[in-house]
C-alpha cells in the first residue's frame, strides 16, 4: 500500500518538501531549498507556472511572492514572444511562440501555442501588451454597445478581469495600458471621445491603478485638447506614448503620459506617422505612403527616431528589397514592430488559411514569408499581431 505524504514548507529549514511515497522499494523523499525552487520555477513557461499554483497552498504562496514574480519577469524579458489574437467562434483566442523562431533563417514555419480563450461578451480591440498584460483598446466603438465590458488579461496565465465602468457622459471610450518599472505598477489610461463635425477631441481623462485593492477610476487634467488615434501606442521605460492630433490646429503630435507623475507632454510630429515602435529602447515612428497599411506596391518606408534631448525627430529612409513585391504581393500588411537588432515583422490585417507573417532583415535587406501554424483553419477574422511580448506570472489584482 502506497502512502502519500503532504507537500509542506518547513519554516525552520526554509525548504519545500516534495511529495514522497513509502512502499516495497523503501522511502523515497527529499526536500528542496526554497531558493532552489524559486530558481527552477523562474525558468519554466508561464503557462506551467500558473498551473503549479494548484499543487498546494505553499506552492501558490511561493508562486505569488514578489521576489519570484519579479525574477520571472526579468528572465522572461530576455526571451520575448510573438503574440497573436483574433475573435472567432464566440471567443477571443490568444496564441504565442518564442520570437527567435521568426529569425531562424533555416525555417519558414513557426508553430504557436494556444494560451487562453476569452468569452465573446468581452467586445474589444486590444492595446499593445505591456510587461505581459493586455487591455481593451476601446469600449463601444467596436462593439456598438454601451454596456460593452472592458477588461485586463494575462495571456500567459489565462487570467482576465473586468475593469470598472468608466464614468462618462460621452459614447466612445479609448484606453491604453502602461507600466512603471521603478514602482512595478500597471496603470490604465482612458479618455472619452467627442466626435462632432469639425470637433474631435478627448475629454474626461481618467486613470486606474492595478494592484491597489478596489479598482477605481480617477480624473486627470490635460492642458491640450487633442484627438487620440485608436492605434500606435507604445510604453517605454515608464512612459506611455500614443499618436494624436491637436483639436484646433489639426497638427499631428505624439502624446507622452508619464506613469509615475501622471502628467501629459506633447511632442510635435512633422508628418502623420502610421505607428509608434520601440527602437532599441528609444521612441520610434514609422511612416509610409499609405497610412495604416503596406503591400507589394510599396518601395520603402521612413523610420523616425526621437531625439529626447532636443525633442526632435530624426528621419531615415529604408528602401525595400526588389523581392518584396513578389513575396508580399497584394496582401495588405502593417508594421508590427522590431525584434532583435534590426528585424521588422509585418502582419496581415485579416487571418487567412494558411496564415503568414513577414520578416524583414534590415541589415541584409532580405524579406521572408513565415507560415504560422496552430491557429486553426479559420479565415476572414481581424487579427492582431504583437512582438516583444513578455510572459508574466503575476496575478491581476
UniProtKB/Swiss-Prot annotation:
This is F-box protein At3g49450. NCBIfam families: F_box_assoc_1. Residues 26-75 form the F-box domain. It comes from Arabidopsis thaliana. CDD domains: F-box_AtFBW1-like. It comes from the Eukaryota. InterPro entries: F-box-assoc_dom_typ3 (IPR013187), F-box-assoc_interact_dom (IPR017451), F-box-like_dom_sf (IPR036047), F-box_dom (IPR001810).
